[in-house]
Amino acid sequence: MISIQNLTFYYGCNPILKDLNLTIQNNSWVSIVGHNGSGKSTLAKILVGLLSCTKGQILIDNIVLNEKNLPLLRPKIGMVFQNPDYQFTGLTVREDIAFGLENHNVCREEIIAKVWQYAKMVKIDDLLDTNVNQLSGGQKQRVAIASILAMEPEIIIFDEVTSFLDPQGALEVQKIIQTIKNKILITITHDLEFAAKSDEIIVLDQGKLITQTPPQNLFQDPLFLQQYKLNPPLSLELYYEILKDSTTKNIKNNQMLENLKDILWQYNLKK
């Protein structure tokens, strides 16, 4: 479990995160959303130990995340970054996935097994002997995900991992993330269509926590989405248009609207 308590972070004199309090349960998937500058990526960097908070604290399994405890906690946390290119140094896919395992003194037989297991999981097992630099952006992100999964962390953070990908590559990466189980998953994204599939959505605005709630609750409030410049999933836009203009369309039956919302919501989750 991750417990964030009164977390504040300053960059120079500027507060980037302001008194955050939130809890992320084990084996849950949360999406962090908010417009640019809301503090999403800063929070991610603090969680993996790349930055230290100015005030407050983070507890991971009741252990304070600080410089002293970082060697103990770092193996529990993996992160896939926004731009996959800078993570690679001309290795083959096989070598890249094995790289972290070799640095952790894992035996050769186990390395071979894990490389195959996670390459197959992310559908790059036919590319194991290909130089990573020859891959597409989506394939590189799948290699990055396999490399993190092979380390078997308890927490994985995905920081805008589809933002540089074409629509097809983004969809493939999103589908892979949805298959990962028995871990804390944190996806930082602008894509509410994708965030809607997570267990909870955390909304940040100007460094402040606005809400932490199941997606269904968030999307029931069009005014809230409008206030924080969040676009609803495309599959729910019809519901909002009808809700906004229900008197003109002579839809008086609230239960009909609720049924429509439920149908569209289930459609979104199954996509």
From Swiss-Prot:
Membrane topology category: Peripheral membrane protein
SMART domains tied to this protein: AAA
GO MF annotation: an example: ATP binding
Main subcellular location of this protein, as a coarse class: membrane
UniProt EC number: 7.-.-.-
GO CC terms in record: ATP-binding cassette (ABC) transporter complex
Stretches assigned to the ABC transporter domain: 2-231
Chain positions recorded as ATP binding sites: 34-41
Residues of the signal peptide: none
Listed InterPro entries: AAA+_ATPase, ABC_transporter-like_ATP-bd, ABC_transporter-like_CS, ABC_transpr_CbiO/EcfA_su, ECF_ABC_transporter_ATP-bd, P-loop_NTPase
Disulfides per UniProt: none
SUPFAM superfamilies from the UniProt entry: P-loop containing nucleoside triphosphate hydrolases
Compartments, as annotated in UniProt: Cell membrane
Keyword list, A-Z: ATP-binding, Cell membrane, Membrane, Nucleotide-binding, Translocase, Transport
Enzyme class of the recorded protein, top EC level: translocase
Function noted in UniProt: ATP-binding (A) component of a common energy-coupling factor (ECF) ABC-transporter complex. Unlike classic ABC transporters this ECF transporter provides the energy necessary to transport a number of different substrates.
Subunit: Forms a stable energy-coupling factor (ECF) transporter complex composed of 2 membrane-embedded substrate-binding proteins (S component), 2 ATP-binding proteins (A component) and 2 transmembrane proteins (T component).
Family (UniProt): Belongs to the ABC transporter superfamily. Energy-coupling factor EcfA family.
The protein's name in its UniProt record: Energy-coupling factor transporter ATP-binding protein EcfA
